Swiss-Prot record:
Subunit structure: Composed of six subunits; NqrA, NqrB, NqrC, NqrD, NqrE and NqrF.
Gene Ontology CC annotation, any one: plasma membrane
Transmembrane segments: 11-31, 35-55, 81-101, 114-134, 144-164, 180-200
Enzyme class of the recorded protein, top EC level: translocase
Name this protein carries in UniProt: Na(+)-translocating NADH-quinone reductase subunit E
Membrane disposition: Multi-pass membrane protein
GO biological process: respiratory electron transport chain; sodium ion transport
InterPro entries the UniProt entry points to: NqrDE/RnfAE, NqrDE/RnfAE_oxidrdctase, NqrE
Keyword tags: Cell inner membrane, Cell membrane, Ion transport, Membrane, NAD, Sodium, Sodium transport, Translocase, Transmembrane, Transmembrane helix, Transport, Ubiquinone
Reactions catalysed, as given in the entry: a ubiquinone + n Na(+)(in) + NADH + H(+) = a ubiquinol + n Na(+)(out) + NAD(+)
One protein family per Pfam: Rnf-Nqr
Cell inner membrane listed as a keyword: yes
An example molecular function term from Gene Ontology annotations: oxidoreductase activity, acting on NAD(P)H, quinone or similar compound as acceptor
Amino acid sequence: MEHYISLFVKAVFVENMALAFFLGMCTFIAISKKVETAIGLGIAVIVVQTITVPANNLIYTYLLKDGALAWAGLPEVDLSFLGLLSYIGVIAAIVQILEMLLDKYVPSLYNALGVFLPLITVNCAIMAGSLFMVERDYNLAESTVYGVGSGFSWALAIAALAGIREKLKYSDVPEGLQGLGITFITIGLMSLGFMSFSGVQL
């Protein structure tokens, strides 16, 4: 259990998708203007990561990696070159299902997220979760914990940035830095804060 807690904490703070690896910056900046919308997208990312990382782990373990098809009598077959296509397919399917559910049950959030909800499919933070899982050779349980942690890390970062940006609306920001200028500086300062976790050994 301690191993899984360490993996979760490491995924959230030490290896934060947005503030340590700078992944998913497009949606991270565009949707972080309001806290409610940012939290909604953050929850969507958590759900997608929690499902896709372990699902892609199963696909890689039992279908794609070298020797994975031994159960089917094909021990020499290596389909790992199909990894990227498979992961994108799984992510696209999960995002499509999530999009339909939000449209039906939470239309206000669906409309607020707009084009950025289907763009989760090509959000590099989502793909990175599956690629890191393969690179680090996680098992199914580790993949599930890592999926939750990596999704939560991105959600935490976007919610924090949205809160800061809402406060900045009422701040006296120099004219040349208003808008994206102060946002980039804020992200950099947040990233410096998260860098303090980089020396933590878990």
